[in-house]
């Protein structure tokens, strides 16, 4: 008796060819591997419909916890998280979690500026360039770190533990734009987010700069926040009447549009039942909102999905509040302040 005969005798369910494509959960019947092969021979293999890997959040955002593996400048550490940075582009944000009393800068490295260019949300320094031997290489399934640091940030030091947050470029999720300032008040900068941004994080990057980071949030269209080494509250206008699905507007301040200066903007979408993600193509995966706590300083926020990454800041105080960062890998007890080099606490 062959294995096929044996299993056919044990499992006697009737084989009914499904009446729809693979992703259609309403299709009746079950595909049998041998029937599938027979259909291939007969050129009758079913269509896979419109399943798109970019529709799933796991292909667009990943949290990865890893251990550093070197104190030198040539050893590598390959981080495989399934994100295609080499072909699609995106941002890698790394932070050291431990290491005794030694704090470490945040490190933001993106595919637009390249793997040797470092920015830190806890610093107003310009884009810093690491030694060519130490860098981040962007792969089609993650990234590879060479060496133990970039310029100021430890990202792979042996004996320390790190978290990385990877955002892949994708319409209605995340985009990166760079531009050179022209000194115009009301300068319009185009983007490829394909929707109106929910949040924009902007930084001047040229060497002569010591300008603070600037943040737009849809909660307060005509305000700006500074997320680097300060917990300041909302400041005066920067963003004009607010961004659209094709562009955003900046004034001519040194931190936003000084003539000849260079800038980078990280754009985050806000889905409002129009994300178009997931297998059904009708799911949201990112939101930028606001909430009010009750008398017990509690609040429940219904996003419509289970978040992996949460960043929040008090918005109704002139003295501001910390930028708090949490994620599902470290849990709600693992807090980072994006404006500080402090270790996880």
Language-model regions, residue ranges each:
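Surface-exposed molecular-recognition determinants
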Residues: 2-11, 15-345
